[in-house]
UniProtKB/Swiss-Prot annotation:
It is found in: Cytoplasm. The lineage of its organism: Bacteria, Pseudomonadati, Pseudomonadota, Gammaproteobacteria, Enterobacterales. GO terms for cellular component: cytosol. Belongs to the TACO1 family. YeeN subfamily. One of its GO terms (molecular function) is DNA binding. The gene is yeeN. Its main location: cytoplasm. This is Probable transcriptional regulatory protein YeeN. InterPro entries: Integrase-like_N, TACO1_YebC-like_2nd/3rd_dom, TACO1_YebC_N, Transcrip_reg_TACO1-like, Transcrip_reg_TACO1-like_dom3, Transcrip_reg_TACO1_YeeN, YebC-like. It comes from Shigella flexneri. Transmembrane segments: none annotated.
Length: 238
């Protein structure tokens, strides 16, 4: 699964330059999680998970606190999750996950991006069946066999455990992501660089330089949209 790990790292690195955009997207996600339950992360597991992910992305504490305070203050915005699927050039596929307070705006924007950037938006399920929803946990380490034993003993449903560039990379069934994190914390592992649910392509394609330029423009435009939280694709050389 080295290629999958490389793609996850590349995606996270590519976003590091757009810090203000990352902060804003996490602010929305934290606010939405706090509004859907208690605004206290110790009483709201969804909120706690989002905050942990925000910290991994180096989102400042004041951004996190501001989003929670907004929820506590009775902010009246309601956010809805969505998923849009489509195609780029030469067998490339793309999934955009959204969190929006205005679904009509989001649908219009996503459709426009696909149309203007050389893609075609598809029906629900037209692409996602070629991706596996997967829990991904990453932390510093070099002994995947030992980690696998910890997870096996905790009855975590694990797809794979690998060592990549000095990191332990764990792929779990999506329902067991939090169980896996808890098992690792119980074993004394508390520092994670990634704890995410990812849509991982079952197979990948490589695009020509010309097609890659078109596809990269499509991905960048989707990621720049304020309502788009995550973008997944099956292009190996992006």
């Amino acid at each position: 699964m080295g290629r999958k790990w490389a793609n996850i790292v590349a995606k996270k690195t590519a976003k590091d330059g757009a810090t203000s955009k990352i902060y804003a997207k996490f602010g929305v996600e934290i606010y939405a999680a706090a509004k859907q339950g208690e605004p206290d992360p110790e009483l709201n597991t969804s909120l706690k998970f989002v905050i942990e992910r925000a910290k991994q992305a180096q989102v400042p504490k004041h951004v996190i606190d501001k989003a929670i305070d907004k929820a506590k203050g009775g902010g009246d915005e309601t956010f809805v999750q969505g998923r849009y699927e489509g195609f780029g050039p030469n067998g490339s596929m793309i999934i955009a996950e959204t969190l929006t307070s205005n679904v009509n705006r989001t649908i219009a924007n996503v459709r426009t991006i696909f149309n203007k950037k050389g893609g075609n938006i598809g029906a629900a399920g037209s692409v996602s069946y070629m991706f596996d929803n997967t829990g991904v946990i990453v932390f510093k380490g070099t002994d995947p066999d030992h980690i696998f034993e910890i997870l096996l003993e905790a009855e975590v449903d694990v797809r794979d455990v690998t060592e990549e560039e000095g990191n332990i990379v764990i792929y779990t069934e999506p329902a067991d992501l939090h169980k896996g994190i808890a098992a690792l914390k119980a074993a004394g592992i508390t520092e994670f660089s990634t704890t995410e649910l990812e849509m991982i392509a079952q197979s990948e394609v490589e695009l020509s330089p010309e097609d890659l330029e078109i596809f990269e423009g499509l991905v960048d435009a989707l990621e720049d949209d304020d309502d788009v939280q995550k973008v997944y694709h099956n292009v190996a050389n992006l």
